[in-house]
Amino acid sequence: MLSRRHLRVKVMQALFAYQRSGGAELAIGEKLLNHSLTRVYDLYIHQLSLIVEVHSFAKQQIEDGKNKRMPTEHDLNPNMRFVENRVLVQLENHPQLEKHISARKINWSEHLELIRRIFTAFKESEEYVEYMNGDEPNYKDQRRIIYKLYEDYLLVNEHLQSIFEEKSMLWMNDFEQVGEMVVRTISDFKKDVDFGGTLKPMYKDEEEDKALVRDLFRKTATNNLEYQKMIEEKLVNWDLERVASTDMLLMKMALSEFINISSIPTKVTMNEYIEISKEYSTPKSKVFINGILDKLLAELKEQGKIKKMGKGLIGN
């Protein structure tokens, strides 16, 4: 599922695009934002389908060996541990995943040579050799080898990343978040549960998360000039032109959360935007943003403009 932080990042990216368009229709910007979120889930399904594809390739390799004109003893009696891996079998037969793959018409047939190279490299790894030849693996061991395959051979493969980026430029910043979703999916699978378990939903709380995305985008966009003025008033000894555009936008989004999103504590808002700045802005941004937001928050509280609702939120 998409974390609140990733949702904020997606809103930030959508607001940048909206600003670059000269402030086109708000509805168009919001539609593009929702599309970018849907595409994150598409990437999640594509990543899971890759694991299934490697499994299918491994099974086909065994069948090809058996059908050789002069098969070896190894060809006729292959080690089946990997292809019979319980997690892989659960993913392969997962009706929910199969439905998603079919709906998106995902097909890796054009990239079988890349799949072959990836699987060949994986088979040479110390972990794979130990898995195939060591003690009989339990379900935990079976999960662990799939983590190895996914994290070290699929997720970080530059050729695969290029393929994904060609499919959608929107995916460029989503690999880490989606990778975590895939790992959590496998981590939550159970040996004795049909098909392992359910796939991760797109949202933790669909109603609340969609409302956050919608309100944060709309309120930040429509109050852009007001928030700009509020921030400028706090830029003592700072030249406005020296303020990074990312810092300015993150502070506007934080202001929007302070004032308009009643269910999120102000401390959470502060921490989230400071953390986002560490990844998307300058090394000094976290200190700068923290200082400006501290001043703005104190002023807003004094003016009675912070209205937080819910258990443990009043006064935060």
Question: What does each model-found stretch correspond to?
Answer:
Residues M1-N316:
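Class I Rossmann-like S-adenosyl-L-methionine
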